[in-house]
Curated annotation (Swiss-Prot):
Keyword Isomerase applies: no
Family the UniProt entry places it in: Belongs to the orthopoxvirus OPG052 family.
Induction: Expressed in the early phase of the viral replicative cycle.
Protein name: Protein OPG052
Bias type Basic residues, positions: 1-10
Biased composition regions of type Basic and acidic residues, renumbered to the chain: 11-21
Keyword set, alphabetical order: Early protein
Gene name as annotated: OPG052
């Protein structure tokens, strides 16, 4: 049950964050600065280090284009 609660809580702030955030893609400077954390932030709504939570980063599958 805790897992489902966690999912529900992380969904609400994600929607709020996306409303305030402009819909433009990140600039090259931002990509170089933050690198991989963009996808991680979208998935878990928090910045993570690769070495801290590597399996969770692997589990992220970006939607097919």
């Amino acid at each position: 049950m805790e897992g489902s609660k966690r999912k529900h809580e992380s969904r609400r702030p994600q929607q709020e964050q996306e409303q305030h955030r402009p819909r433009t893609p990140p600039s090259y400077e931002e990509i170089a600065k933050y690198g991989h954390s963009f996808n991680v932030k979208r998935f878990t709504n928090e910045e993570m280090c690769l070495k801290n939570d590597y399996p969770r980063i692997i589990s992220y599958n970006p939607p097919p284009k």
